[in-house]
Amino acid sequence: MLESICKAHPKLMVSDYEIKEESQPRTYQTLCYLKEKGYACKLLFGSDKLPELKTGWKHVEEIAKEFGIVCMARYDDDCEKMILNDSYLSSLSQYIEIVHTPKEYHHIYSSEARKQFLIAKDAIQILQDTLPKELHGLSSYLFSEDNHEK
């Protein structure tokens, strides 16, 4: 699914690097891997994550200096002010690019998408555990775009 989305957007790509690793690599490791493969990368996140950089992330300075950070401003977040009022973020400000996204995209969060995906995945597993094996293909039918009203 993601690969088909990327076909329409040449600047995007899908990598299975993190999935294939034995343990979950840190963001910095993933960015280094992609750089080794010849890709130019930056860390992209929403403004809700900006305050977490100091305490919730590892290798932040390395990521900022080696790759750069792109922060998507959401809702009425004043990212410039958030950075200015925080000494840690201010020290990284030259590496942070603020992107003001259109309002129709403010509600889109990758963490929420992952959460909903896991809920759906669990529901499919419950469905498969409940139904006879002959009906296990039902989940692909239920989630096919051809079977949804538009």
Could you describe each region identified by the protein language model?
Residues 1-150:
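Nucleotidyltransferase catalytic core that binds NTPs
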